[in-house]
């Protein structure tokens, strides 16, 4: 199928009259990609079709199977009367016409083929603007022609035929960019633009070409991946069918031995179905291969090749235009200058002169011949006549130009016209050695030729006129149409004979060859059926239509003959434009022409191919087969000798038979063949074929099994460690506490070993400890700032006074402190307190570790260490001996009899002796820390020894406030410290330790900054300036008032200043344990978190919040939000219990508070009744209803707060049993509980009904924003006119006559059980 590509349209004489600057040679137009094309003819055109080998024949089946048929395809005979020029331009018409047909019938008969032919000819002859300049441009002429030709050549979009290839859109898109380049050239040529604009337009063409080429290749890669994936799936399915056929074959052999014919017939049918499916699969695989090859060929040969050609033509066009501008600038030299040509310029002018001489001498002779040359048809003759006419016009214009030149140049001197011989050193081979000189005095004039430029601008107009005239003549004159068709048919046969006459058979090479001169003619006449190109051998094989022979063409010879007309690349592009299937075999491409990505892919693919080749070599294949065979043999031996017998012993026979793991033993039993039985049978055959049952075999079996097990164990161990990490979920997790324990244990073992090594080396631990002795000047927390020691302040001052003046205690006869034990949990500040006491007393501290005092190389060394420690300390008194984790080496004595433990007890005894001896030597205090003082030996805790025990508890609220305030002064901006309500912060940090409280102020400030909206780009720009010039500003300048003022202004400008509202907002959002979060951070919800899903939860939360706001002096609602990340979403309310000024006094609950709590429990339940549609009630309020029943029961039975104010208490938690009472009295108690229960329900219902608008507004805003604060709730109540309750708030004062519900009294015994068993 032929088509005309928009990227390669040319004139009929494009191969003979192409411009010289297109002769770039085969090297310059070498494609940058490997191109592999294929003939895209139909599958019926192939001489051979693929045979699908029947499955039955492969596996030995004897039944009748479907066999794939081989179709015989032959070339159809084409009648001479039905052939027209080419596939695309051929007109099929019968050679005999009926003379009786009317004029209208004849016109109707020839209209359609003629219009089709004319359309194709018009498309073939119409130039495209993007390729007009490089295809037909010739050396320039003077500006006279430009002034006469003011008509602009209109751009006409080439409408491609329906049979065009799929990449024509990319070509059109690139041609649109090329049209911009051509317009730019025209503008610059008219001196209305700059030359740089041409370069920019060319760059735009290159960029667009790269973009389009990338799109084409990405589409190709995507299609290739999809098709190859489908092909792999089909291959796997085919392999599976083969495996199934093998299994059916084995079954048929078994059935054949048993004589079961019916089952044999069923197997035969199954095999037929499988064979049919197998054949279809391979047919589909062939189709996929064809599609893959077609897509690759089409993409690379058409899409990419056309884009590359367009880009190169544009580059040549720009080069030609630049030469034209240079030549114009050369002509514009002032008249006073003397023309002096260089040697290279003379050579170029001689080349142009020879070319123009040949054109002017040969073409007129050709046109004057009566018989047209065999290579020219009538169209070519008409074209030559037109060229002759243009040459005559050119000569006339040239004579006029010479006359005008004579008039202007007479003033320079006498006219001289003579022939000058070129010197031998400057002569160019192949050109005349003499040239004509035209001189006016000393001025030389060179007259250019005008025909080239005139032909260029008249080409398009001539095409349009010729096409219109031919079409009109064919439609009007029927006889002319018949004659035209007959001539075309005759011309086709004549063209084929001419081409065949240029072929011969080379007996030496045993091949048919074709003259390279005949190839362009055969291509232009569309006589070539297909072509194969081998660039590495520089040959081409062409096949003519209707002939099965391939003709050899020498590309090198062709390149030499047509070097000036584009060479072989021009021929290749013309073949693509004519739709000739051309396949380019793989060839060597220089690495310099490949991009980095292509070079990387080339290296990787080459390496992959090399490894595949090595893997398929005989040596590697034999080694691989040997190793796999050995592994299989070992597996079979282990399974037969160990695994299969164990399985048969453990699993009963009946169970194995049902699982398909055993063959039937009875005739009536049947079982299908399973993979297990197949594996067992193959393993048994393999095992029996190698088992010799001698000692040597068993010995080697044990050796092989041991080696195999060792390797397999380490492989699985490696995979267990590495595979999870590669998959992305890390190694198998163990208990972190156990891992931490082993690390700590290893550390202590290392320390103990290290101490023993030092002792062996003669290192004294006591000397080492005193070498580390230091005075504490700046403790972590000064003693005056310690907030949790108010109750122990007097004892601590006593210890400090003793250390400062030990003699004062001795003179007064007071008992001096001998040992101090600081007890507290981790993080309470035990070590900080010891250092603070040392700093306050201004005495040194000796830090002793437990491992340094323990037993060493001999028995009793620990006691000696203690004696030496205290002796040295007395010499250096006053001093503090500080021991951390005192319970590690001062534990309870008498639990063990081991020698090591006995030495430990001697260590404690010596420590007791030293503590008792303090009366003689003062100024030494043993200060130790521990978490559990009960683990220390009681003798050490008796009076007179370590009797000063400081218990560090969790700080109180006031102490936490002081700790927070002190930490804020150190870490926060001083201006922000007073903006925070530290009392409120201390209430929310109850469970935090002092060391954690110090981090809260910094977290508050950072969270406040995170909640602000900042301009990140502006902030980063300022930060970069600060980082660059901060070292230039001196420190004294920063401390000035002006610098501080400017800093504050800059902070305000960047929005970094924090206000009191920002800090209060952060404090309100603090979590109960001191963790600060900027609002509620939600994860991805587990369900679709829509408005319908959120509505029940929002109603539940809004009811709780509103009832809390309406009750006076009750708990405070701080936050209200919806949490979609919980199970199916959840509504949340954060309510803080009142601790002062309300209904709860301390830890005791008043009657008023319990009644308010009872009313509060009905808030969410009543809200759901009011806002949810009937029947959509849920169980979200069930826990609160249960809580209300519990409160009502406790008020009546335990507290005596019934509706009748009876003080009788009927149940106590510490009583042996409940108060005995009759059934009637129990009914009365149940009635009281129900009465107060219903009173609370009615009270809550009335409150919410009066504030229904407020409830709806809270629900609506909660659904919209998903979070509301206490301020938001107060605003909603105020804006919507909420009605709050006032004090006194009592349920017993409500007018109530009879209980609304008698649910407790409907049945006899159950109310008793419910009443007495109610949770309290």
UniProtKB/Swiss-Prot annotation:
Keywords annotated in UniProt: ATP-binding, Chloroplast, Hydrolase, Membrane, Nucleotide-binding, Plastid, Protease, Transit peptide, Transmembrane, Transmembrane helix
A GO CC annotation given for this chain: Ycf2/FtsHi complex
Gene3D superfamilies from the UniProt entry: P-loop containing nucleotide triphosphate hydrolases, Peptidase M41
Keyword rRNA-binding: no
Cross-referenced Pfam families: AAA, Peptidase_M41
InterPro entries reported in the protein's UniProt record: AAA+_ATPase, ATPase_AAA_core, P-loop_NTPase, Peptidase_M41, Peptidase_M41-like
Signal sequence interval, chain numbering: none
Main localization of the protein described in the UniProt heading: plastid
Subcellular location: Plastid, Chloroplast membrane
Phenotypic consequence of gene deletion: Embryo defective.
Domain of life: Eukaryota
Lipid bilayer topology: Multi-pass membrane protein
GO biological process, one term: regulation of photorespiration
Positions of transmembrane segments: 571-591, 633-653, 695-715
GO MF entry, a single one: ATP-dependent peptidase activity
Family: In the N-terminal section; belongs to the AAA ATPase family.
Job description of the protein: Required for plastid development during embryogenesis. Might be involved in chaperone functions or play a structural role in the thylakoid FtsH complex.
Subunit-structure text: Oligomer.
Name used for this protein in its record: Probable inactive ATP-dependent zinc metalloprotease FTSHI 5, chloroplastic
Lineage of origin: Eukaryota, Viridiplantae, Streptophyta, Embryophyta, Tracheophyta
């Amino acid at each position: 199928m032929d088509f005309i590509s928009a990227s390669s349209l040319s004139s009929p004489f494009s191969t003979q009259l192409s411009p010289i600057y297109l002769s770039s040679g085969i090297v310059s137009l070498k494609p940058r990609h490997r191109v592999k094309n294929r003939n895209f003819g139909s599958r019926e055109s192939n001489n051979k079709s693929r045979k699908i080998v029947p499955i039955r024949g492969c596996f030995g089946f004897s039944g009748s199977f479907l066999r794939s048929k081989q179709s015989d395809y032959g070339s159809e005979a084409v009648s001479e009367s039905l052939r027209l020029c080419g596939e695309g331009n051929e007109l099929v018409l019968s050679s005999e016409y009926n003379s009786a047909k009317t004029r209208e019938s004849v016109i109707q008969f020839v209209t359609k083929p003629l219009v089709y032919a004319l359309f194709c000819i018009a498309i073939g002859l119409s130039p495209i603007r993007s390729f007009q300049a490089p295809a037909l441009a010739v050396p320039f002429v003077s500006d006279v022609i430009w002034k006469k030709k003011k008509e602009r050549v209109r751009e006409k979009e080439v409408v491609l035929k329906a049979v065009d290839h799929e990449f024509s859109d990319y070509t059109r898109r690139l041609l649109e960019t090329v049209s911009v380049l051509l317009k730019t050239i025209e503008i610059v040529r008219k001196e209305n633009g700059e030359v740089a604009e041409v370069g920019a337009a060319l760059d735009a063409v290159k960029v667009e070409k790269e973009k389009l080429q990338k799109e084409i290749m990405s589409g190709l890669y995507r299609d290739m991946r999809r098709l190859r994936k489908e092909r792999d799936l089909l291959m796997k399915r085919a392999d599976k069918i083969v495996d199934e056929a093998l299994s059916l074959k084995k079954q048929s052999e078994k059935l054949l031995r048993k004589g079961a014919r019916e089952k044999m017939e069923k197997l035969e049918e199954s095999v037929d179905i499988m064979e049919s499916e197998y054949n279809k699969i391979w047919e589909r695989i062939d189709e996929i291969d064809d599609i893959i090859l077609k897509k690759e060929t089409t993409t690379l040969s058409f899409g990419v090749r056309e884009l590359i050609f367009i880009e190169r033509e544009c580059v040549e066009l720009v080069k030609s235009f630049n030469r034209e501008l240079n030549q114009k600038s050369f002509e514009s030299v002032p008249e006073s200058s003397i023309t002096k040509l260089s040697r290279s310029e003379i050579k170029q002018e001689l080349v142009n002169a020879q070319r123009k001489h040949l054109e002017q001498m040969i073409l007129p002779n050709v046109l004057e011949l009566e018989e047209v040359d065999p290579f020219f048809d009538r169209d070519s003759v008409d074209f030559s006549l037109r060229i002759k006419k243009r040459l005559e016009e050119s000569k006339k214009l040239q004579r006029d130009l010479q006359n005008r030149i004579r008039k202007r140049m007479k003033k320079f001197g006498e006219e001289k016209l003579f022939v000058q011989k070129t010197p031998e050193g400057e002569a160019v081979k192949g050109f005349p050695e003499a040239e004509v000189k035209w001189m006016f005095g000393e001025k030389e004039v060179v007259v250019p030729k005008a025909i080239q430029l005139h032909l260029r601008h008249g080409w398009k107009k001539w095409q349009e006129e010729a096409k219109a005239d031919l079409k009109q003549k064919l439609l009007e004159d029927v006889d002319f149409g018949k004659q035209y068709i007959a001539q075309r048919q005759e011309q086709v046969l004549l063209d084929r004979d001419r081409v065949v006459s240029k072929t011969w058979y080379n007996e030496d090479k045993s091949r048919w060859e074709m003259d390279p001169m005949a190839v362009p003619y055969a291509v232009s006449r569309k006589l070539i059926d297909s072509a194969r190109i081998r660039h590495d051998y520089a040959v081409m094989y062409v096949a003519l239509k209707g002939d099965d022979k391939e003709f050899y063409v020498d590309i090198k010879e062709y390149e030499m003959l047509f070097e000036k007309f584009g060479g072989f690349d021009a021929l290749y592009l013309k073949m693509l434009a004519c739709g000739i299937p051309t396949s380019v075999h793989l060839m060597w491409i220089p690495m310099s022409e490949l991009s980095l990505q292509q070079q990387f892919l080339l290296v990787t693919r080459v390496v992959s191919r090399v490894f595949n080749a090595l893997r398929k070599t005989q040596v590697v294949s034999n080694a691989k087969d040997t190793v796999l065979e050995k592994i299989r043999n070992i597996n079979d031996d282990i399974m037969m000798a160990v695994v299969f017998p164990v399985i048969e012993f453990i699993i009963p026979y009946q169970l194995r038979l049902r699982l398909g793991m055993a063959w039937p033993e009875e005739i009536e039993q049947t079982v299908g063949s399973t993979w297990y039985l197949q594996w067992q049978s193959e393993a048994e055959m393999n095992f029996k074929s190698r088992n010799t049952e001698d000692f040597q075999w068993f010995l080697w079996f044990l050796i092989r099994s041991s080696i195999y097990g060792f390797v397999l164990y380490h492989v699985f161990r490696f995979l267990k460690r590495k595979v999870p990490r590669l998959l992305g979920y890390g190694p198998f997790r163990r208990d972190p506490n156990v891992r931490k324990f082993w690390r700590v244990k290893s550390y202590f073992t290392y320390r103990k070993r290290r101490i023993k090594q030092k002792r062996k080396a003669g290192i004294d631990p006591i000397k080492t400890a005193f070498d580390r002795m230091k005075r504490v000047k700046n403790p972590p927390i000064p003693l005056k700032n310690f907030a949790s020691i108010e109750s122990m302040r007097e004892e601590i001052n006593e210890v400090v006074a003793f250390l400062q003046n030990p003699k004062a205690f001795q003179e007064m006869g007071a008992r001096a402190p001998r040992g101090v034990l600081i007890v507290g949990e981790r993080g309470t500040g035990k070590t900080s307190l010891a250092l603070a006491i040392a700093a306050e007393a201004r005495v040194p501290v000796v830090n002793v570790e437990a491992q340094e005092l323990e037993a060493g190389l001999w028995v009793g060394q620990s006691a000696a260490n203690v004696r030496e420690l205290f002796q040295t300390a007395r010499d250096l008194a006053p001093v503090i001996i500080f021991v951390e984790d005192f319970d590690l080496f001062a534990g309870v004595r008498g639990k063990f009899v081991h020698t090591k433990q006995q030495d430990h007890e001697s260590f404690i005894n010596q420590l007791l002796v030293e503590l008792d001896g303090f009366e003689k030597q003062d100024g030494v205090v043993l200060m130790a820390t521990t978490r559990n003082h009960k683990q220390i030996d009681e003798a050490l805790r008796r009076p007179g020894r370590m009797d000063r025990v400081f218990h560090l508890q969790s700080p109180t609220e006031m102490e936490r406030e002081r700790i927070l305030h002190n930490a804020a002064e150190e870490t926060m901006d001083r201006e922000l410290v007073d903006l925070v309500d530290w009392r409120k912060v201390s209430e929310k940090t109850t469970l935090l330790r002092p060391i954690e409280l110090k981090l809260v102020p910094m977290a508050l400030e950072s969270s406040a900054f995170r909640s602000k909206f900042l301009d990140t780009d502006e902030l980063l720009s300022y930060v970069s300036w600060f980082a660059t010039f901060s070292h230039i500003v001196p420190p004294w300048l920063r401390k000035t008032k002006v610098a501080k003022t400017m800093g504050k202004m800059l902070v305000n400008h960047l929005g970094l200043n924090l206000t009191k509202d920002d800090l209060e907002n952060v404090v309100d959002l603090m979590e109960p344990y001191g963790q600060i979060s900027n609002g509620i951070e939600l994860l991805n919800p587990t369900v679709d978190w829509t408005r319908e899903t959120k509505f029940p939860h929002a109603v539940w939360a809004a009811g709780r919040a509103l009832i809390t706001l309406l009750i006076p002096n009750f708990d405070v609602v701080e936050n209200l939000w919806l949490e979609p990340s919980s199970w199916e979403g959840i509504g949340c309310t954060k309510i803080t219990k009142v601790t002062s000024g309300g209904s709860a006094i301390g830890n005791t609950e008043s009657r008023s508070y319990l009644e308010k709590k009872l009313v509060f429990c009905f808030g969410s339940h009543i809200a759901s009744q009011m806002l949810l549609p009937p029947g959509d009630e849920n169980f979200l309020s069930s826990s609160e209803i249960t809580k209300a029943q519990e409160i009502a029961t406790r008020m009546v039975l335990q507290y005596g707060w019934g509706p009748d104010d009876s003080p009788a208490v009927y149940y106590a938690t510490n009583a042996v049993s409940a108060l005995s009472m009759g059934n009637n009295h129990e009914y009365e108690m149940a009635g009281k509980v129900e009465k107060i229960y219903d009173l609370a329900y009615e009270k809550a219902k009335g409150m919410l009904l009066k504030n229904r608008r407020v409830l709806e507004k809270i629900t609506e805003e909660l659904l919209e924003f998903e979070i509301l604060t206490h301020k938001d709730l107060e605003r909603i109540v105020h804006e919507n006119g909420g009605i709050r309750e006032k004090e006194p708030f009592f349920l017993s004062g409500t007018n109530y006559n009879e209980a609304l519900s008698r649910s407790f009294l409907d049945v006899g015994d159950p109310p008793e059980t419910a009443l007495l068993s109610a949770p309290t």
